[in-house]
Amino acid sequence: MRILVTNDDGIQSKGIIILAELLSEEHDVFVVAPDKERSATGHSITIHVPLWIKKVFISERVVAYSTTGTPADCVKLAYNVIMDKKVDLIVSGVNRGPNMGMDILYSGTVSGAMEGAMMNIPSIAISSANYESPDFEGAARFLIDFLKEFDFSLLDPFTMLNINVPAGEIKGWKFTRQSRRRWNDYFEERVSPFGEKYYWMMGEVIEDDDRDDVDYKAVREGYVSITPIHPFLTNERCLKKLREVYD
């Protein structure tokens, strides 16, 4: 396959280098990734300033470019400019840390894959779910094995897979729902060396979903969480209720 690999941790991150190297043993791999970390940029794109592309070296088997854009920009540039619209699969990652629950709305990693899904190209976001001790190689090797078994024709149009891999021994994988996992944010007030006040965002994770088949519970139990997601955000049940009342 011709595989496009991107991420939000940047072109020099260990996660993308390990993933690209291992995928290139069996596939034609193109890396197009941000020239610096773009974590938590969501699905932003660049429209008011130029985008620059620079060829970089990762290995002999991998064609790689850095860009000044976001992960979504990288996918657009790769598809339309670098790869001449010949892409069989898009993989975004391996991210350092989980992308579960409401994280996916902020995640540049997920948005890179979602951009592919919006083009109706098979797309996967993959994350090593332990931020402090990420196992990039373990996640990459899981993905390689998964690609040999998974039938992408089972996915609905414009649908991608969000994969979170636990560190350590993997018991198996589970298809999961996106959880209600979220953050309680607060801001720590600090003072610069120049005496100027500034704020640093902090947060505490909230994991109180009462459903059993959600992403973070699978990861906590040692399973890879695989969640099919899409860009369409309409709450169908609420829409039906509103129409019944107001139409």
UniProtKB/Swiss-Prot annotation:
Its main location: cytoplasm. GO terms for cellular component: cytoplasm. A divalent metal cation binds at residues 8-9, 39, 95. InterPro entries: SurE, SurE-like_Pase/nucleotidase, SurE-like_sf. Its cofactor is a divalent metal cation. Binds 1 divalent metal cation per subunit. The keyword Nucleotide-binding applies. Keywords: Cytoplasm, Hydrolase, Metal-binding, Nucleotide-binding. Coiled coil: none annotated. GO terms for molecular function: 3'-nucleotidase activity; 5'-nucleotidase activity; exopolyphosphatase activity; metal ion binding; nucleotide binding. It is found in: Cytoplasm. It is an enzyme of class 3 (hydrolase). PANTHER family: 5'-NUCLEOTIDASE SURE, 5'_3'-NUCLEOTIDASE SURE. Nucleotidase that shows phosphatase activity on nucleoside 5'-monophosphates. Belongs to the SurE nucleotidase family. This is 5'-nucleotidase SurE. It comes from Thermotoga petrophila (strain ATCC BAA-488 / DSM 13995 / JCM 10881 / RKU-1).
